[in-house]
Amino acid sequence: MKSRLFLIAVLSLLCGSFVSAQAQNSDEYDVFLLIGQSNMAGRGYMIEGEEDVFDENVFLLNDAGEVVPATNPLNQYSSIRKGMSIQRIGPGLGFSKKISKKTGRKILLVVNARGGTTLAQWAKGESGDGYYEEAVRRTKQAMQYGTLKAIIWHQGCGDSK
């Protein structure tokens, strides 16, 4: 229960941090922040030939703050990720396909996940690792292109004990 309340508090702080940035954005993209642990970073394998089957309306925010067509691994531009060799497929692929089909709008994904972290490490100013601050910074970059529609968190097993 404590972990859930903590997560709600962290996400509330994230949402509040974006209010001022929304007034100055474009409306070209629906922005989605995908953060969390290894499950969000992507550790799954895809069937050969289906690795990069994205809708033409799905994009990523790259490490230079620019919009590029989405390709896997989605966590490739994360400012906090572990090595590229372990970045694979996460829930962002299926999510982006569904949301793009449902809305018909351009989707901009900000994927900034890191495996092996705990909820406490994502708290604002708590860990010194800067995961919260990086999520806020990258989302503000993306909001020059569109409006933040949702923050999607996927827990790994960092707090399972």
Regions found by a protein language model. Name each.
Residues I8-S17:
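Bacterial N-terminal signal peptides
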Residues Q24-K161:
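Cell-envelope and extracellular/periplasmic
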Residues R4, G16, G116-L119:
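Compositionally biased, low-complexity segments enriched in small residues
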